[in-house]
Amino acid sequence: MTYCVGIRLNAGLVFLSDSRTNAGMDQIGTFRKMMVYEKAGDRFMVMLSAGNLSISQSVREILQVEKLDNGDGEPITMWNAKSMFDAVRVLGSAVRRVYGQDGQSLKAAGIDFNCSMIFGGQIKGEAMRMFLVYSAGNFIEATRETCFFQVGESKYGKPILDRVLTPRTPLDEAAKCALVSMDSTLKSNLSVGLPLDLLVYEAGSLQSSQIVCIDEQNPYFQMIHNTWGQRLREVFESIDDPRWDGSSSTHPLMSPLQRHEPVRKITHPGERIV
């Protein structure tokens, strides 16, 4: 499995992905999930992929040459698209092309056609945009109300993103938040693993030099891992324990209920709850 997160902010974009592929306990490999497409000064795009590795790799290859009919005009590719919307349409077409080639064979082998992508960036003359692409090639776009997307093992790392991120979050703070999200996922799920790829894009730059590969020896990620775990324990220990004896407390547990009653006990075979 994998875990990837993409964040769209007023200040720019943040992308983070792991690199573990799990096809069974004896078949764990390292494959990069991040692809960066850059034509400096004209366009900058990033794709993060999750799901079946063979499908994702096929989509990557076809995306480079995929063309959309444009009537009497030049066919649309990811390299000449005038908008990120057109670029993600090209990606969706590449996904559907792979399905047309391999979908029935995979189904006959009992394998689901499973892939999902986060695709974001900026094309000259347009604002930054970010999309979540599904297995059918359809997609949705990030908004001010939903400024991040996740693919893969998303549940472990989502709470910190929900609590911290807003469109006004600074880029470095968002990158830190993404790394905490990844650390939480690594702690709870063996199918996600190092090394990680982290990329930060500043709005309007149409290029990025802030890209790093993070392994087990990375000092900053080690600090994130140790500090986050320690501070969580400190906060947990600072919270009052529940009191069951009804004694005085600032935050009593055994408080009177306005509408509901505690769960009833069944004390003999003939008793019914209702």
List where the protein language model places each region.
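Conserved short S/T/G-enriched processing/targeting/catalytic segments and their helical context
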Residues: C4-Q104, V151-T169, M223-V274
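Conserved mixed alpha/beta catalytic, RNA-binding, or beta-rich assembly cores of soluble enzyme
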Residues: M128-T166, D172, C177-V180
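A hydrophobic, small-residue-rich beta->alpha segment in the mid-to-C-terminal subdomain
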Residues: C177, L199-S238
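Active-site periphery "cap/insert" segments of enzyme catalytic domains
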Residues: V90-F131
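Active-site/pore-lining binding-face segments in mid-to-C-terminal subdomains
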Residues: L171-A203
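Short beta-strand scaffold segments in enzyme catalytic cores
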Residues: T2-R8, L13-L16, C115-Q122, F131, ...
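Solvent-exposed alpha-helices and their adjacent loops that cap or buttress functional pockets
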Residues: M1, I7-R8, Q27-I28, Y37-G41, ...
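Short acidic-glycine loop/turn motifs at beta-strand connectors
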Residues: L9-G12, A40-G41, Q122-E126, Y134-A136, ...
